[in-house]
């Protein structure tokens, strides 16, 4: 199966090279593949033994297009995309504002013929999903496309899911779901043979009731819908659409879930582009005023923490990837850290190594916290920190992070019963990566900072093995930005 999958990925991706010469980006190509594969699968579903009502209007099916060549093929494909963009339901969402970006008719014909040769419906969802995930990863690897910011390393996603241990008939949300990686990992975990052996009702709920997603970027939203569809999540011909399009931070969506697994987009500030009186475009900080938020701020990640707290059930649990600044930023950052300690059980922080994200120099962490019923007592008693960053170095190509690299953290986390944990750090073993801190210790720290490290960084003492220049530059820029924001906050306070 692996050979078949990799062969199809190679075939499909091999078509992209000549398209690149015509100025078609990886993202555009992946979008066109989404449209074409969907049309082919709909054609297969319309035939025996399925005989489904696909919703594709007569005259605009795969069969109406697949035998054409040249200008006729281009014209039919263009007309098909326009017609389908006018449809309702999930069909209209996938094809919204769809246009043909493959101007070379000969290459379009070759792609259509290549897709036509495969029986997509009879392929297992594992194979289809792996093919599409493979293409999404190749798209993420294209630095120019910027798609990497929507792609969380799959080993990290799987580790987060294993720590949360989702159960059947429970709901899972990702408020910025990108291409759907967290949902697919949760589905894989739930359907692993021998784990739960789900009955018919549980399987139906997994398909149509488990997942609640949102995505801000239209093209990524389409890729996500297709990715979930290929993995048998949601009903493309029904009313169940597991993902919505829009700014998830604008309002409380109303639903409450058992688990949140997410990696909010990198970048501190939310902003909107405005046109001033002189006709010039300016960016203004976007501030969300929501009654359910603890504090008003333009910091995107801090707002996501508040949003996640809202959508969790009273006993809900979350695992969230967040940048370092969330751990130490003053002002709103300190308020939110204190609120997390007081109202949730913030029990675990995984400090991530650099070199695992497609955006260079990113320093991030995974925060694990459980929501608790309202109480005057501080809910967080101890915070366990696993330092997976100091003296750990990965690269995307030569030395990528694997599932095996996260096994020690999962063992320390002890998902079976996290109340039975043992530190690996001690005065006798100062390089132990797993260490416990009491809430009292944290509250005594300047600004209630959670930016804690204790292992000696060997690279700082070894001038021949300094961090990558991009990483150093990113650190300098981040430190300057943090200093500037602190000065700005001080100035605002002095004006009062």
Predicted regions: what they are:
Residues 271-299, 324-332, 353-359, 374, ...:
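Short, contiguous acidic/charged loop-to-helix segments that flank catalytic cores in large enzymes
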Residues 146-262, 267-274, 278-280, 290-292, ...:
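Conserved S-adenosyl-L-methionine
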Residues 42, 370-374:
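Short loop segments at secondary-structure junctions
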Residues 29, 216-221, 294-369:
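Conserved Class I SAM-dependent methyltransferase catalytic core
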Residues 257-258, 362-368, 399-404:
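Short, surface-exposed amphipathic charged segments that create phosphate/polyanion-binding patches used
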Residues 224, 263, 285-286, 308, ...:
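Conserved RecA-like P-loop NTPase ATPase core
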Residues 1-168, 232, 237-248, 351-355, ...:
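Non-catalytic, mostly N-terminal accessory regions of nucleic-acid modification and defense proteins
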